[in-house]
């Protein structure tokens, strides 16, 4: 048949092939459906709801099931659900395993715990592309940072009814997918015992299709973005589109339209087929008339044979050169194998050397531990000696104070005795007089009053001592704070002086050796595949007008400002070596990243507030995109007032993760989620440029010095107020104490006077005793003073003894610290060697794999060389069949294939011309006749087959279109009924209205407070969220997918609606045996809703490690 094409249309052959293929597919499907109806008599995914398997007969009727205990009955789930998920080095998971239930599963955990990574792993493991997960454009982006590969293992149940090839796979089907950084991803389909059945993706797709798991259906596996898009669809057209895609109605419509287009195109081409058939018939009739023989001239045939031989010998020469090139390629690959082998040998030698050195270091550590213990023992002994000397010193001091107190008391007694003696001497000349009984009563009253005064005096003494202690504590606190602020001010003044002298201190803000590090990188830049870039803070500048946000922005992205960027792991290792050689002590992050420029405008924060991107200038666009990747700066907004920022975040603005607010020059606020507020302290050193680095933070340092000076004065004033208050209290207590002592003195004097008058006799005995007592007191004072001088000498002696002990204490402490530092250094050294050994082992495995690939390539090329040589020999034999190579060289023939082809065409035309002039032989006429007849009969048969196939296709399309309309009505009806049932949970009513003309889906809700149903867009936030959740469940109802998943369905719900929504999900999905449902949420489901069902499984993820430095509520 002659190939005919029409401008603007597909070739007829392609249309015919598609038509026949479609017809054959239809017939196969009908035959399969007939076989299925004969074998099972059930519909896909719902086939086991009406009947239950019986152990003996294979089925048990529904009436038998009805007799079972309805309280304990739980419908058995069919095969195909995911039993276990195992992840290795996938996204944030290093080694993770999770067992899932056959029905409803909740995966709960805090943000950052890796919940969404589980859903991503399931979709990727079942054959989805990376772009379908909204987690990256390439599968390699999903490999855990620092790792060469990631592995996803899914265990599918195959033990129940509806199993897939159970005789081959057993009770489990294991799907394994491996992602590599330096190679393509691979699949593996294994049986229950781990035996690999297939490694082809199409076989895994066959299993997935068998269990009816539409991985590519966006409504089957709703990621965070997909769930957000569906649950917040703003227009009725969006809702209609989501519903039609999820229930596959849209795909069916597109397939029917495509089949109709094929049918119409085939009908148009039938006329061309008929014309071709007529042309074949004419050729067939002409062939009958040919009777003459054709003779060919011998010269033309000879020339044609030589040309064909020359063409074959040229091919032999070309293939011989190609064989030599392949052999040269083998030599090159073998050289690479030798290089990789040398690298493996070097790594193994390093591993042996580090292992040997590690044993030596461990021995040094053991010796150093003993040495540290000895130094610690010496230090403890010195401490004990110092403590004993201090105890003696304090004891002698106490004795000295006691002696001084006794001296003061003795002198007071001497003064009192002098007065008494003077009074007695005066009384000797007087007569004793007065009422002694009255004086005794007055004496008793004075003794009681004196006792009360003594108690008051003791209380005031204690209070006075307490207030003095408080005054001393306040003074100590004041000195400590003043000393800290003064030291900070002095440091900043020194930094300002360095800047004024022209010393560039900007790089020292990252590390004191940063300038040395940059010089070393510049000197060794040829060793890098791509020179390292950093620190990133030196490539960023605060725009004019945003200077007040400098510290707040630096605090928000501080982890990225210190970082350096390298392009591959090799440069990463080289950069770490350079850092160690330059003595970098700061924590410098190293980011392995290939700089690129991309459009992130769709991810920018929505609102009238500026973002960090608006406040920064970057040295080049690639650096800007790097900060977007590292710190999400396009989603951090700048709002001065924290209350305004909180109100803005509570409105859930699009693409906003955090807001920064100002507080003072030393601290600020970071807000996220509308409810969380962290108070952060700014760093003193500036690690990004301000106004093109014109001042390098000079003005900020001056402002900070001025502020700290004011703060210093404020501290002085504050403590002065405290001290004034304490001293006022001290003065008051001291005045009361003096008054009390005066009262006691007067009382004692009067009591002494009364006692003397009561016991007075006219004699000199009392006077003499007082004189003797005064003499004894004076002698005691003299002895106390001598003891005091002796104690002073002892104290000086103890102080002299303490000096060498203090020096010994300091020296032992210093030796202990040095020994501990050396021990720590040895431990860090051995840890570093262990990490290097592990790295070299990983490198060895990597190079072994690389060597294996090289060797396999050599084997493949050797096979190709052998095949090529064998082909060359066959070509030589074919060429020799025409003529020898020597004969070709002696004949004047063209040297290129193009020239040979042109001359062959010319010779062939001359032969054809001769044939036309001379006619054909009888055999040739017969051959031509047979050929034309066969072509005509074949064309006629194919025309009839196509015509019949078109008729069958037309009838099938009409039947399929009618079935689609019925299915569409049934699907919409099921969704509407399920939606209505979900609304009853909150005592609402309503319906789904599908409008085909405008392709829109309207949702009408009648709440308990409404008289008339309203559109869902007019509802409150909670009611709207509940309605959207009911719509999602209604969409799932007719989907009949074996597995469905939803990520963070409650992200826009408050606590009340979250509880209602969760209760609705549990009620609707917990008893559905044909579908395994996976719900991911950051909320604790156990606290939100009461869940007590064997059909519900809750899996709690481990919380991520993070710190909260907020002091907002302190």
Curated annotation (Swiss-Prot):
Miscellaneous comment text of the record: Present with 339 molecules/cell in log phase SD medium.
Job of this protein: Acts in a DNA repair pathway for removal of UV-induced DNA damage that is distinct from classical nucleotide excision repair and in repair of ionizing radiation damage. Functions in homologous recombination repair of DNA double strand breaks and in recovery of stalled replication forks. Probably plays a role in structure.
Species in which this protein is naturally found: Saccharomyces cerevisiae (strain ATCC 204508 / S288c) (Baker's yeast)
GO terms for MF: ATP binding; ATP hydrolysis activity; damaged DNA binding; single-stranded DNA binding
Name under which the protein is recorded: Structural maintenance of chromosomes protein 6
Family to which the UniProt record says this protein belongs: Belongs to the SMC family. SMC6 subfamily.
Annotated positions binding ATP: 109-116
Classification via Pfam families: AAA_23
GO cellular component: chromosome, telomeric region; mitochondrion; nucleus; site of double-strand break; Smc5-Smc6 complex
UniProtKB keywords: ATP-binding, Chromosome, Coiled coil, DNA damage, DNA recombination, DNA repair, Nucleotide-binding, Nucleus
GO BP annotations listed: chromatin looping; chromosome separation; DNA double-strand break attachment to nuclear envelope; DNA repair; double-strand break repair via homologous recombination; regulation of telomere maintenance; resolution of DNA recombination intermediates
């Amino acid at each position: 048949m002659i190939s005919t094409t029409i401008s603007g249309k597909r070739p007829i052959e392609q249309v015919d092939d598609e038509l026949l293929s479609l017809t054959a597919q239809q017939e196969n499907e009908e035959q399969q459906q007939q076989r299925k109806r004969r074998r099972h008599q059930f519909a896909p995914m719902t086939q086991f709801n009406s009947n239950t398997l019986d152990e003996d007969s294979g089925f048990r009727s529904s009436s038998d099931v009805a007799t079972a205990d309805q309280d304990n009955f739980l419908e058995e789930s069919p095969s195909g659900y995911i039993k276990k998920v195992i992840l290795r080095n996938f996204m944030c998971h290093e080694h993770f395993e999770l067992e899932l239930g056959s029905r409803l599963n909740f995966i709960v955990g805090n943000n950052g715990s890796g919940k969404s990574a589980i859903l991503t792993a399931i979709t990727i493991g079942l054959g989805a592309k990376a772009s379908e997960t909204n987690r990256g454009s390439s599968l390699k982006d999903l490999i855990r940072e620092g790792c060469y590969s990631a592995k996803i293992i899914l265990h599918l149940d195959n033990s129940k009814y509806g199993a897939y090839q159970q005789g081959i796979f057993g009770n489990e089907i294991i799907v394994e997918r491996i992602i590599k950084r330096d190679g393509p991803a691979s699949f593996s389909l294994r049986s229950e015992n781990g035996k690999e059945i297939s490694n082809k993706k199409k076989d895994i797709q066959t299993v997935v299709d068998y269990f009816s798991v539409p991985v590519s259906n966006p409504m089957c596996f709703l990621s965070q973005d997909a769930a957000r898009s569906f649950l917040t669809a703003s227009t009725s057209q969006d809702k209609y589109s989501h519903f039609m895609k999820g229930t596959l109605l849209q795909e069916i419509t597109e397939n029917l339209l495509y089949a109709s287009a094929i049918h119409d195109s085939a009908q148009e081409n039938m006329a061309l087929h008929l014309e071709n058939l007529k042309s074949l018939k004419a050729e067939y009739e002409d062939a009958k008339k040919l009777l003459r023989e054709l003779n060919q001239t011998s010269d033309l045939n000879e020339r044609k044979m030589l040309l064909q031989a020359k063409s074959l010998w040229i091919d032999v020469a070309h293939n011989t050169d190609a064989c030599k090139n392949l052999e040269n390629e083998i030599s090159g690959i073998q050289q690479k194998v030798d290089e990789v082998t040398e690298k493996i040998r070097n790594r193994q030698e390093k591993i042996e050397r580090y292992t040997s050195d590690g044993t030596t270091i461990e021995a040094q550590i053991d010796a150093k531990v003993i040495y540290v213990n000895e130094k610690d023992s010496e230090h403890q002994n010195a401490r004990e000696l110092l403590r004993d000397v201090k105890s003696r010193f304090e004891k002698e001091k106490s004795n000295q104070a006691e002696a001084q107190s006794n001296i003061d008391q003795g002198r007071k007694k001497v003064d009192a005795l002098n007065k008494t003696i003077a009074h007695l001497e005066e009384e000797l000349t007087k007569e004793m007089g007065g009422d002694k009984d009255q004086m005794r009563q007055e004496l008793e009253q004075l003794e009681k009053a004196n006792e009360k005064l003594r108690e008051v005096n003791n209380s005031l003494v204690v209070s006075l001592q307490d207030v003095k202690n408080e005054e001393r504590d306040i003074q100590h606190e004041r000195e400590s704070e003043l000393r800290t602020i003064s030291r900070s001010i002095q440091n900043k003044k020194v930094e300002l002086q360095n800047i004024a002298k022209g010393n560039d201190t900007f790089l020292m803000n990252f590390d004191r050796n940063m300038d040395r590090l940059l010089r070393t990188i510049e000197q060794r830049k040829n060793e890098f595949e791509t020179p390292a870039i950093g620190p990133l803070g030196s490539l960023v500048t605060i725009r004019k007008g945003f200077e007040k946000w400098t510290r707040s922005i630096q605090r928000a992205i501080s982890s990225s400002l210190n970082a350096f960027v390298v392009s591959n792991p090799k440069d990463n290792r080289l950069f770490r070596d350079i850092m160690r050689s330059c003595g970098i002590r700061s924590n410098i992050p190293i980011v392995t990243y290939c700089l690129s420029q991309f459009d992130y405008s769709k991810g920018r924060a929505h609102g009238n507030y500026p973002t960090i991107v608006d406040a920064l200038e970057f040295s080049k666009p690639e650096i800007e995109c790097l900060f977007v990747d590292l710190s999400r700066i396009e989603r951090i907004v700048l709002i001065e007032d924290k209350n305004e920022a909180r109100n803005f975040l509570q409105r859930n603005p699009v693409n906003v993760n955090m807001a920064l607010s100002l507080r003072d020059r030393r601290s600020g606020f970071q807000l996220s989620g509308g409810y969380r507020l962290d108070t952060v302290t700014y760093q003193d050193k500036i690690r990004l440029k301000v106004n093109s680095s014109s001042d390098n933070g000079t003005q900020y340092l001056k402002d900070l010095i001025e502020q700290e000076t004011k703060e210093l004065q404020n501290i002085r004033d504050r403590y002065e107020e405290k001290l004034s208050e304490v001293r006022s209290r001290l003065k008051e207590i001291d005045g009361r104490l003096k008054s009390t002592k005066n009262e006691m003195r007067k009382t004692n004097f009067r009591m002494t006077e009364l006692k003397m008058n009561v016991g007075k006799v006219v004699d000199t005995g009392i006077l003499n005793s007082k004189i003797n007592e005064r003499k004894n007191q004076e002698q005691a004072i003299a002895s106390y003073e001598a003891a005091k001088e002796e104690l002073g000498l002892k104290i000086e002696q103890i102080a002299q003894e303490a000096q060498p002990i203090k020096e010994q204490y300091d020296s032992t402490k210093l030796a202990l610290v040095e020994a501990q530092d050396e021990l720590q250094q040895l431990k860090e050294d051995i840890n570093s060697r262990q990490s290097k050994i592990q790295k070299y082992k990983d490198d060895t495995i990597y190079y072994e794999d690389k060597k294996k690939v090289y060797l396999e390539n050599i084997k493949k090329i050797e096979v190709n060389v052998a095949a090529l040589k064998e082909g060359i020999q066959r070509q030589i034999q074919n060429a020799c069949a025409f003529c020898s190579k020597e004969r070709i060289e002696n004949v004047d023939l063209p040297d290129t294939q193009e020239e040979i082809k042109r001359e062959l065409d010319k010779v062939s035309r001359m032969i054809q011309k001769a044939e036309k002039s001379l006619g054909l032989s009888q055999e040739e006429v017969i051959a031509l006749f047979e050929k034309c007849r066969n072509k005509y009969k074949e064309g006629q048969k194919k025309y009839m087959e196509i015509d019949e196939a078109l008729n069958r296709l037309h009838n099938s399309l009409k039947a399929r279109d009618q079935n689609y309309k019925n299915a569409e009505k049934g699907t919409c009806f099921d969704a509407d009924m399920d939606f209505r049932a979900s609304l009853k949970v909150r005592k609402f009513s309503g319906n789904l209205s599908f409008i085909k003309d405008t392709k829109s889906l309207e949702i009408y809700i009648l709440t308990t407070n409404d008289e008339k149903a309203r559109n869902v867009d007019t509802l409150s936030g909670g009611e709207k969220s509940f309605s959207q959740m009911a719509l999602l469940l209604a969409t799932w109802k007719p989907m009949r997918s074996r597995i469905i998943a939803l990520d963070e369905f409650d992200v826009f719900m408050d606590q009340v609606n979250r509880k209602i929504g969760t209760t609705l999900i549990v009620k609707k999905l917990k008893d559905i045996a044909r579908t395994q449902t996976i719900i991911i949420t950051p909320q604790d489901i156990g606290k939100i809703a009461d869940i007590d069902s064997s059909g519900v499984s809750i899996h709690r993820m481990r919380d991520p490690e993070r710190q909260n430095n907020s002091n907002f509520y302190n």
